[in-house]
Swiss-Prot record:
InterPro entries: PAPS/APS_Rdtase, PAPS_reduct_dom, PAPS_reductase_CysH, Rossmann-like_a/b/a_fold. It is an enzyme of class 1 (oxidoreductase). The gene is cysH. This is Phosphoadenosine 5'-phosphosulfate reductase. Catalyzes the formation of sulfite from phosphoadenosine 5'-phosphosulfate (PAPS) using thioredoxin as an electron donor. Its EC number is 1.8.4.8.
Length: 244
């Protein structure tokens, strides 16, 4: 596979750009997660960054990418409403894996947002989307810009939700290359990787949580629920970071 030039790809007509990415993805689908990361580091432009919500399976991508690219910036968008267990998990993994953690937050504090807008997460889809734009999307865009990121790694998996079921290994999003090394992993593969490397799930996994975000928009899984129903009251699956 030849080295990909972001500017050259963006200059192509849309159909040609889609075909070029599809050809590369067909080859990447045959590689292991480790091989995908290695390929990206060799063939895609730096600077590189890895985003993480420090959710249930976060240790997998953090370990995988950091092993091949030590000191890669790890971007966390902190809303101020994460579970106490999440903040503890962040500290634990940062220390254990020696992560180069970069924390980005909204330009308005959580208290100031509530004073101005009320509890946005209780205001339906429109309120949730505004909340996500302020607390997730804008801080992430700022992080990518300030870190001069051209290649962005993330730990999404197709099995997690319908909205992720058709995502490719490689895409262009927010003006940068986006690489999803474990996109085709199932829950068993995640478990096996964690066991092999002495890593843990998020502490709330043992309490029945399949997905963990903010305290006010995360629910425990109950029989009959799809995983996406445990977030944002079932109104949305994505927080905005991986859309668009």
């Amino acid at each position: 596979m030849s080295v990909l030039d972001l500017n050259a790809l963006n200059a192509l007509p849309k159909v040609e750009r889609i075909l070029a990415l599809a050809e590369t993805n067909a080859k990447l689908e045959k590689l292991s997660a480790e091989e995908r990361v290695a390929w990206a580091l060799e063939n895609l432009p730096g600077e590189y960054a890895l985003s993480s919500s420090f959710g249930i399976q976060a240790a997998v991508s953090l370990h995988l990418v950091n092993q091949l690219r030590p000191d890669i910036p790890v971007i966390l968008t902190d809303t101020g409403y994460l579970f106490p267990e999440t903040y503890q998990f962040i500290d634990e993994l940062t220390d254990k894996l020696k992560l180069n953690l970069k924390v980005y937050r909204a330009q308005e504090s959580a208290a100031w947002q509530e004073a101005r807008y009320g509890k946005l997460w209780e205001q339906g889809v429109e309120g949730i989307e505004k909340y996500n734009e302020i607390n997730k999307v804008e801080p992430m865009n700022r992080a990518l810009k300030e870190l001069n990121t051209q290649t962005w790694f993330a730990g999404l998996r197709r099995e997690q939700s319908g909205s992720r079921a058709t995502l490719p290994v490689l895409a262009i999003q927010r003006g940068v290359f986006k690489v999803l090394p474990i996109i085709d992993w199932d829950n068993r593969t995640v478990y096996q990787y964690l066991q092999k490397h002495g890593l843990k799930y998020h502490p709330l996994w043992d309490q029945g949580y399949l997905s963990v975000g903010d305290t006010h928009t995360t629910r425990k899984w109950e029989p009959g629920m799809a995983e996406e129903e445990t977030r944002f009251f079932g109104l949305k699956r994505e927080c905005g970071l991986h859309e668009g």
